[in-house]
Amino acid sequence: MIKKTARTAAREASADGLNWTFAPMVDISRDARWGRVMEGAGEDPFLGSLIAKARVEGFQGDNLSDISTIAACAKHYAGYGFSEAGRDYNTADFNHYTLHNTILPPFKAANDAGVKTFMNAFNTIDEIPATGHKILQRDILKKD
């Protein structure tokens, strides 16, 4: 069902001339106060991974040269759903175990499904902005 809804959204968007969507939002979030919690798949990384895969496949179809498909963008890489006190653009606090076992699995699922782009998160990790975090950007995203 989720794949079908993403497929429908892709058909509608592509019919209007769009070829790229800033979706799916695959952040795992566990604080209901966060204003973007409804965009994601909830708090379970396994379910979040299944939904990320389905949405990427729905948006992109089997062949991006098909005019009814659009490129997907897995966001927000990574940890944005763990922002403190549920506040947008806030510091995110989590350890490396949580990063690898809770936060990253939906991004890996999106990547394995062939997602064409990633959007960086707005938070810091170890007081380093996610956009410039060497371990996150180079060692994990580019190599793993």
Question: Which role does the model predict for each range below?
Answer:
Residues 1-144:
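Glycoside hydrolase catalytic-domain context in secreted enzymes
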